């Protein structure tokens, strides 16, 4: 099975975001309060009332991308990492989300981008049982011999955007963020999933 090169204009997606206001103020319902005497001291205090009041304020419900990355043709997991404990949980998560994963049918020479890690930041406190992580670094483009049996996650699938946000090393809400990809990450090391940027067709096994 061949995956043809994309012909459309390259798509860019965000990896960093800032929250944006809606512009004009809107009325937000908040719980009203009433003044009542403190049962212990007798002093006046505020207590929740059984009603709501509309308060004009700006609402922050949208996000704006502050840094973009081009969507690659897909992502490559080299054969030595296929079946390894290091990426087992990541592959499980991708499959649980319904993201299509294919297998290279033969050895191929491809242009890929590898991400070299320059900085790792972890949240000082756990959130939902995880130490949220962020990576900083740079991509370099190389020609690579991809072994048959390596895995390919194509970007020409309905869940491409989801795949991007989960896989990209600098994503602010991906597999790195939630420590799903954690083992082996260190400054000076290469992120284990590569971006495929080659214009040539890719040969994968038919399902």
Predicted regions located by residue number:
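Catalytic centers of hydrolytic enzymes
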Residues: 69, 79, 83-85, 91-96, ...
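Hard-cation-handling environments
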Residues: 1-112, 116
